[in-house]
A protein has these predicted regions:
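Short, Lys/Arg-enriched N-terminal segments with co-localized hydrophobic residues
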Residues: 1-10
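N-terminal intrinsically disordered, cationic/polar leader segments
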Residues: 9-91, 95-164, 168, 173-198
Length: 198
């Protein structure tokens, strides 16, 4: 997976912040791979050799290894990047991440059988999406309310990818406000061509 390396100073400042290990969570590392286990699951993340990960006294700290010859700004970016990724894993396995999506449109429906999700979105055929086993999914359709789908997982990156995939089935459109939206999301509306011509 590709990551955007951003602003050395800010990312390095983030990298200096220690991570507290919550009760019920364990962290280990082997061969540049950090593994985090907790009540919500287990996640692993490769860490670039230029970053040293120290686990001690219920704290995880990150430091730049000066023995590795790297571009200075890239090192600083790595410093903050991997600290953020490991912190996301700690939060994920201890608390989990949840997103709720709302289907806005006449006749739109969503249902699931286990992790197989079926969407009816105004096309001539339904859309099926098989979610990974480490993901929990719940769908709800109530009278006079838009159908919703709620997704929970320990993996923040995976959650983002799944939500992006689902939204791509019916991207929010700015004229009628229809589409698949995050719960509470407000679509910035535009005037149609006929209205703009008046």
């Amino acid at each position: 997976m590709l990551y955007l390396l951003i602003g050395g100073f800010d990312m390095s400042r983030i990298g200096k912040l220690p991570i507290s290990i919550p009760a019920g969570v364990s962290i280990s590392q082997k061969d540049n791979v950090v593994t985090v286990k907790g009540p919500k699951g287990e996640l692993s993340q490769y860490v670039h050799p230029s970053i040293k990960v120290n686990i001690e006294n219920s704290l995880v700290t990150f430091e730049i290894d000066a023995n590795h010859i790297e571009n200075s700004k890239q090192k600083q970016a790595y410093h903050g990047l991997y600290r953020s990724l490991v912190n996301n894993m700690v939060v994920g396995v201890s608390e989990g991440y949840t997103k709720t999506l709302e289907l806005v449109g006449v006749g739109y429906r969503v249902s699931n059988q286990g992790n197989l999700v079926e969407f009816t979105l105004g096309y001539t055929h339904p859309i099926f999406l098989q979610l990974p086993k480490e993901v929990k999914v719940e769908t709800k359709s109530e009278r006079n309310q838009n159908p919703v789908i709620t997704i929970e997982t320990a993996d923040k990156q995976l959650l983002g990818l799944i939500c992006a995939k689902i939204r791509s089935f019916r991207k929010p459109e700015p004229y009628k406000g229809k589409g698949i939206l995050f719960k509470g999301e407000v679509v910035r509306r535009k005037s149609g061509k006929s209205a703009a011509a008046k």
